[in-house]
């Protein structure tokens, strides 16, 4: 009996980050009770961390990002590693609390970056869920689009800043 419970649990947990895994993410409810905020997170330049410092450091980065996500969001929602360097949080919080939690996450990640020089930046997008106005799937897609929009914007600004420095 204990083995069966352990086996079921390990099928739902990502072994590296100890967050819920993609299987759990894909079996999440199609609707949520009340308002929620869905965050999509992606580790910036993760491939270069792996290529430069090795997969051991890359794994440590993912574990640290997962730990930071859990520390900030676990009391208000579900935290998932959905694959590679992508994470999702479904938080049962109000729209007005969304910025507060995002700020807390970024502050915590910055504090951890001081201790771990390999910890890169994380791009985050989020969208608010209102059961009477949209589906969970639509909100997830919006959050994902916002995250990629932010990531492209950062790369564009970095290129512009580098071009300015070179000239």
Describe each region flagged by the PLM.
Residues 1-11, 40, 45, 52-53, ...:
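Gram-positive cell-envelope targeting signals
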